[in-house]
């Protein structure tokens, strides 16, 4: 860990890579287009450019070096330990990239007729069948483009279900105060009123608080299991009983499903709907602007309402069909094909026993690291955690140090920072999730470095308040960035496409 001061700070800080527009040179070329063999006459004039596109101009080597340097300024699972809580930043096995690159998948056009895409349809159908087994559900849709999209899909399914039953008076969705922010946002987008379930001091759902807001107006109760505090709801059977007695549906936010693989199935726990984040639990790529995938599983009473189109098997033949009671299409085609194929490869590669080991190692790593950090900072819950845990840096406030300062110091120590200030019910929260992929040596080193940072906060807080000193950008004005964002390079505006 390097925490330097004064002139050393700027000397040791790596430079920021200029934008691609700043290194663009008029006339530079990476490729030479092939001359048209014949005159193009079938493009209407309205689609033809009247002026050049205004693209940056570089040689291929310059472009490669530019983006390679940018990648070296970033941190990812392939370069650093990445304990970003509630995000399950596990390693993505590179062998999985070979599956969507197979010519039978890669060269397939989405408008190919069913006869010409039997292998692709079979792969997606097989993936759905495997997910049904993993989740304990009766039917699956692969259409949602992300976890939050899966949430909205599940909420629309619940709305259609109650409309079909004639229970349109069910206009409320209940969400615990520890939930992901997407839960209330998705509920609102789905046309429901959101009511909050207050947690007990331990972080678990308060049954009295649940009973207080549960009524005949309740359509859905959304629960993240395990919770964002890294706790299993100790009274979940009673929660399920009360929700079902009220005639409502139970939704599981499967963002933390990495703790359950091969151990528990949402359907067996009593949930009616669940989504799973493939980029978390099934090791498909994170971020990059997409594509993503958030498959949704449902019990049989909700299956008729799943989005169209559905892949149907008849003997050895696979067809695409629409269902009359469906909520309709929620996106184009059958989902994010490259992501879904990677997730299928992951399930096939691990098998049932391998999936169980994934969760057991995730639980082991989280509890080992939590035990190593015991007594350093206050934590949430007592006893064992699940796949992640939450610490609070509130005790350091008397020294002028907050969670964000610890996170900045963690960057200087050579890691990606944990999630901070979430869950909202924990002051100065640091949410740490090591995943199953990390070695004991990595966890030991992280624990030692975090311990040194906390001791530094107690003895020399000024040093920590200057961190990070090893990154291109230190401490941007976050308020100004939020209120006056500059999202486009001024040089790009001058060359607007």
PLM ranges: what are they?
Residues 1-139, 264, 314-319, 323-330, ...:
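Non-catalytic terminal extensions of PLP-dependent enzymes
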Residues 86-89, 94-96, 147, 159, ...:
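Short, glycine-/Ser/Thr-/acidic-enriched flexible segments
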Residues 119, 149-315, 400-401, 428:
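Conserved PLP-enzyme active-site core in the AAT-like
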Residues 138-144, 172-175:
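A short, small-residue-rich loop immediately preceding and capping a beta-strand
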Residues 141, 195-197, 418:
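General small-molecule cofactor/ligand-binding pocket signal
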Residues 157-160, 169-170, 190, 345-349, ...:
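Conserved thiamine diphosphate
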Residues 213, 335-338, 381:
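A generic short alpha-helical patch detector that favors 3-5-residue windows
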């Amino acid at each position: 860990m390097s925490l330097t001061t004064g002139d050393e700070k700027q000397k040791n800080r790596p430079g920021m890579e200029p934008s691609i527009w700043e290194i663009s040179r008029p006339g530079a070329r990476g490729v030479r287009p092939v001359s048209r063999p014949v005159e193009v006459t079938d493009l209407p004039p309205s689609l033809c450019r009247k002026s050049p596109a205004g693209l940056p101009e570089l040689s291929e080597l310059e472009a490669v070096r530019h983006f390679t340097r940018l990648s070296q300024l970033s941190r990812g699972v392939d370069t650093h330990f990445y304990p970003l809580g509630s995000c399950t930043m596990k390693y993505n096995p590179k062998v999985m990239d070979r599956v969507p690159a197979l010519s039978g998948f890669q060269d397939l056009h989405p408008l190919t007729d069913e006869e010409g895409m039997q292998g692709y349809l079979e792969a997606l159908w097989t993936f759905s069948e495997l997910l049904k087994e993993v989740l304990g559900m009766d039917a699956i849709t692969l259409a949602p483009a992300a976890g939050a999209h899966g949430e909205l899909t599940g909420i629309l399914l619940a709305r259609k279900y109650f409309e079909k039953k004639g229970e349109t008076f069910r206009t409320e969705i209940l969400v615990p105060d520890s939930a992901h922010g997407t839960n209330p946002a998705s509920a609102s987008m789905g046309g429901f009123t959101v009511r909050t379930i207050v947690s007990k001091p331990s972080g678990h759902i308060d049954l009295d608080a649940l009973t207080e807001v549960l009524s005949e107006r309740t359509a859905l109760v959304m629960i993240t299991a395990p919770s964002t505090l890294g706790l299993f709801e100790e009274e979940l059977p009673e929660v399920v009983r009360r929700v079902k007695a009220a005639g409502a549906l139970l939704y599981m936010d499967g963002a933390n499903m990495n703790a359950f693989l091969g151990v528990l199935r949402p359907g067996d726990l009593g949930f009616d709907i669940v989504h799973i984040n493939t980029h978390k639990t099934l090791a498909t790529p994170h971020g990059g602007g997409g594509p993503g995938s958030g498959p949704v599983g449902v019990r049989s009473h909700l299956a008729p309402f799943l989005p169209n189109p559905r892949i149907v098997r008849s003997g050895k033949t696979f067809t695409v069909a629409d269902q009359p009671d469906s909520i309709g299409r929620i996106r184009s085609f059958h989902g994010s094909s490259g992501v879904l194929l990677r997730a299928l490869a992951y399930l096939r590669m691990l098998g049932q026993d391998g999936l169980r080991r994934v969760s057991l190692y995730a639980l082991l790593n989280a509890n080992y690291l939590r035990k190593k950090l015991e007594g350093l900072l206050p934590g949430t819950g007592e006893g064992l955690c699940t796949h992640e845990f939450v610490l609070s840096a509130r005790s350091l406030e008397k020294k002028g140090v907050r969670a964000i300062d610890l996170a900045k110091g963690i960057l200087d120590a050579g890691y990606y920072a944990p999630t901070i200030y979430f869950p909202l019910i924990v002051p100065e929260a640091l949410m740490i999730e090591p995943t199953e992929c990390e070695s004991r040596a990595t966890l030991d080193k992280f624990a030692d470095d975090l311990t040194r940072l906390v001791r530094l906060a107690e003895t020399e807080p000024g040093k920590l308040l200057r961190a990070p000193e090893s990154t291109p950008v230190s401490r941007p004005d976050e308020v100004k960035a939020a209120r006056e964002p500059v999202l486009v390079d001024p040089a790009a505006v001058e060359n607007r496409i």
